[in-house]
Amino acid sequence: MELTLWTYEGPPHIGAMRIATSMKKLHYVLHAPQGDTYADLLFTMIERRGSRPPVTYTTFQARDLGGDTAELVKGHIKEAVDRFKPETLLVGESCTAELIQDQPGSLAKGMGFDIPIVSLELPAYSKKENWGGSETFYQIVRTLLKDHSNESKHTWQEEKRRPRVNLLGPTLLGFRCRDDVLEIQKLLGQYGIDVNVVAPLGASPADILRIPNADVNVCLYPEIAESTCIWLERNLNIPFTTTVPLGVGATQDFLKELHKVLEMEIPQSVNESNNSKLTWYSNSVDSNYLTGKRVFIFGDGTHALAAARIANEELGFKVVGLGTYSREMARKVRPAAKALGLEALITNDYLEVEDAIKETSPELVLGTQMERHSAKRLGIPCAVISTPMHVQDVPARYSPQMGWEGANVIFDDWVHPLMMGLEEHLIGMFKHDFEFVDGHQSHLGHLGGKGTQNTNKEAIKTNLQDSVITDSDPIWTHEGEKELSKIPFFVRGKVRRNTENYARQAGCREINEETLYDAKAHYKA
């Protein structure tokens, strides 16, 4: 067992809950103790939904364990069916209830309901949230379509209609899924392609039954939909796309792949460079400032891989770290990291990720909510590219990540922290100039002239300093700290560590301005 303050993924029943809450006319009975009802907050607080998840908890307590908990489960299942009247019922158990082995799915199937019942067996102690979501979606599709005929159907050309596709994978608590769906629907409409079903987000069991009416499945989020797409291809002969349209290059490749699978002629407009402002900026003089910037990437497999491609091929960044917390995606991330001359970081320990960030000294971190906190402590700009996320990453406005507009949003989210970082560095460099001195006359007239107290001087220095100082650690003098503060904040941590290592080797007890430049010469030699 591992005790941690933060975790990238919850247990698999949270993934099942995401699928159930994303869909309509479906209910989830979860055999769980009273403490596991916290999951409701994920949707009401972070997603800011106006309704509770369609989940009924058995909420057994310690005193119930001495009796027949199976009867408790059956009672809650009957109440849920009578009250909510779902078209499909999901039945599962949380990590705690798994130990009791009541097998609620089998109990539900023996109660004689005339609706499809999906029994979820999610190994809570070996799998996590994304796997649970993927398995739940797979079981729903397989249960509802198991009797569907596998006979070959007519193509869209034979039926003389526009081609149809399914968009599979978007869920609640996914990263910008709502807006991605709208953007991809708009994008496909421009090329004469209709969307048949979007699932699981917004889909009902009746919509799942319409999945075979499509010509192609678009796998938008492999963590959730890949296993389902493979089953649909194998059993219903529906091919699926493998390119995720994140970034300009990937969007072009996605459109080419989709046109090829649909046997459509690829239009020239797919390759036009004016579809996104990201391409224009990358070709502009202004982008020279960002060329070669060191970037560290960590997130779910889909977004981490896409971020690495965008950073390396479209923005000219240097990727110094690449990793994922999703072990199911590790097989795809490792070769991508190797192609960049890196070793992939596969871990679910946020402290290990923070140590990797310190070691690589990037100028920009692209990660999750946890990397945002780590980067803030280290004084490094950060943009969130993946779940887990907090409420500020679920904007009320339209803010996709996929397609042409998604590339624009990514461009803004990644470039702005670096540009603001340059401004911060310039202010830090010239803060001793007379125009920045506290008490100088302000352009605001009567509101100016009052000195402002700097309440966060440590932020100017750096917060990469070890919290525990031993007798062997050299001490920074005031002159040394002052000179260190003139170094750009995004490399200041690395300079501090190198200087301290040099001072230890040279036997210096104090680090002054001269020691700092001696260390610089030593490491350049």
Swiss-Prot record:
Pfam families, per database record: Oxidored_nitro (PF00148), PCP_red (PF08369)
GO MF annotation list: 4 iron, 4 sulfur cluster binding; ATP binding; metal ion binding; oxidoreductase activity, acting on iron-sulfur proteins as donors; oxidoreductase activity, acting on the CH-CH group of donors, iron-sulfur protein as acceptor
Protein name per its UniProtKB record: Light-independent protochlorophyllide reductase subunit B
Gene name per UniProt: chlB
Task performed by this protein: Component of the dark-operative protochlorophyllide reductase (DPOR) that uses Mg-ATP and reduced ferredoxin to reduce ring D of protochlorophyllide (Pchlide) to form chlorophyllide a (Chlide). This reaction is light-independent. The NB-protein (ChlN-ChlB) is the catalytic component of the complex.
Gene Ontology annotations of biological process type: light-independent chlorophyll biosynthetic process; photosynthesis, dark reaction
Known EC number: 1.3.7.7
InterPro entries: ChlB/BchB/BchZ, LI-POR_suB-like_C, Nase/OxRdtase_comp1, P-CP_red_C, Protochl_reductB, Protochlorophyllide_Rdtase
Keyword Iron-sulfur attached: yes
